[in-house]
Amino acid sequence: MVDILNLTFEELETFLVEKLGEKKFRARQIWQWLWNKYVRDFDQMTNVSKQTRAQLKEHARIFWPEVVTTSKSQDGTTKFLLRLADGALVETVLIPGSQGRITQCLSCQVGCAMGCTFCATGTLGFERNMTMSEILGQVLVAREYLNDVAERPILRNLVFMGMGEPLLNLDEIMRSLHTLNSELGLQFSPRRITVSTCGVNPEGLRRLGESGLAYLAVSLHAPTQELRRTIMPKAARWELNDFIEALQSYPLKTRERITFEYLLLGGVNDSLEHAKQLVRLVSRTKAKLNLIVYNPSGDEADPYAAPTEERILAFEQYLWSKHVTAIIRKSKGADIKAACGQLKAAETGGTPCCAQND
């Protein structure tokens, strides 16, 4: 039984011709029903013959992730706990911006292998990669949900900043990006998609850059290799200087810059000396910085705390004084554990990690 949402347009054409004996033109019809009209049942495809629909039901399935729980924050953030076909749980978050625009934070793996010490997802360990249909199923769930909201907000931006490291699931990420960008698919411009990476896969970074299918964000969080090795032990396997050198040759569009994400941890990476080191590092690239304040887990064993307001502002002001664009990003959804670093999918609670506004 074929997961039809896991087929690219070209793969769908091949499936219809070789498996079902259909003409190629059927692919466009079926594709539009799947990705533009969001149908869940082949019988809803009214311009497809009954015979073809019967064959589709026999040989294929349309599977959307099951919404287990929906949580709504006081700030308007919405979090979905989703169950995949094999029972695995992941989360996705809708973050409200201005003028009714919504940013969706997407997961790409069940669990995460990176083990970053400040991120709840890191405690889960890695279970498996998500498929294209599972990744894009999050978008289908979001669009269906938003269509039923009275204000009809617009799903404008997608950020791969949820569970998992995108460049460790590169093949499915690339397949997903092609479908997202397709005029026949979900019709998202590359300028509305951001892929975030810890920097663990040089070949993946090269392929993503050459594709031009998304903007790049870098989960940096430390200005030196030594500190990065302490708080992001697996990400630090790629030497920071080598990573920055790779970013120097990363292809950027006109006026495009690489976004560096920097989570401020009180007493760990938030001093003036850290700010100076950070300036020396990121000034080697076309960069802008998103400063994200740590969200305490509430666990007594949590080794980290948020910096003081004074230290946050001093850090930001130093960056600006050295002509480095830096924005303090407000993490939304903390009251439902949907803020940065809180992602830990579970039926008893849990959540993803974004601090992205439109």
Swiss-Prot record:
Question: Record keywords: Transferase included?
Answer: yes
Q: Which cofactor does it need?
A: [4Fe-4S] cluster
Where does the protein end up?
Cytoplasm
Q: Which reaction does it catalyse?
A: adenosine(2503) in 23S rRNA + 2 reduced [2Fe-2S]-[ferredoxin] + 2 S-adenosyl-L-methionine = 2-methyladenosine(2503) in 23S rRNA + 5'-deoxyadenosine + L-methionine + 2 oxidized [2Fe-2S]-[ferredoxin] + S-adenosyl-L-homocysteine; adenosine(37) in tRNA + 2 reduced [2Fe-2S]-[ferredoxin] + 2 S-adenosyl-L-methionine = 2-methyladenosine(37) in tRNA + 5'-deoxyadenosine + L-methionine + 2 oxidized [2Fe-2S]-[ferredoxin] + S-adenosyl-L-homocysteine
Every Radical SAM core domain range: 98-335
* CDD domains cross-referenced by the UniProt entry: Radical_SAM
The protein's matches in InterPro entries, at most eight in alphabetical order, are given as: Aldolase_TIM (IPR013785), Methyltransferase_A (IPR040072), RlmN_N (IPR048641), RNA_MTrfase_RlmN (IPR027492), rRNA_lsu_MTrfase_RlmN/Cfr (IPR004383), rSAM (IPR007197)
User: In which family does this protein belong, per the annotation?
Assistant: Belongs to the radical SAM superfamily. RlmN family.
Q: Where does S-adenosyl-L-methionine bind?
A: G164, E165, S196, S219, L220, H221, N295
Q: Which regions form coiled coils?
A: none
Q: Name one GO cellular component term.
A: cytoplasm
Q: Where is the active site?
A: E91 (proton acceptor), C340 (s-methylcysteine intermediate)
Which Pfam families does this entry report, sorted A to Z? Radical_SAM (PF04055), RlmN_N (PF21016)
UniProt enzyme class:
transferase
Which species does the entry assign this protein to? Answer: Oleidesulfovibrio alaskensis (strain ATCC BAA-1058 / DSM 17464 / G20)
**Name of the protein this chain belongs to:** Dual-specificity RNA methyltransferase RlmN
- Keyword field: 4Fe-4S, Cytoplasm, Disulfide bond, Iron, Iron-sulfur, Metal-binding, Methyltransferase, rRNA processing, S-adenosyl-L-methionine, Transferase, tRNA processing
Co-factor: note:
Binds 1 [4Fe-4S] cluster. The cluster is coordinated with 3 cysteines and an exchangeable S-adenosyl-L-methionine.
Q: What does this protein do?
A: Specifically methylates position 2 of adenine 2503 in 23S rRNA and position 2 of adenine 37 in tRNAs. m2A2503 modification seems to play a crucial role in the proofreading step occurring at the peptidyl transferase center and thus would serve to optimize ribosomal fidelity.
Q: What is its main location?
A: cytoplasm
Give the free-text miscellaneous remark of the entry.
Reaction proceeds by a ping-pong mechanism involving intermediate methylation of a conserved cysteine residue.
* Keyword 4Fe-4S in annotation: yes
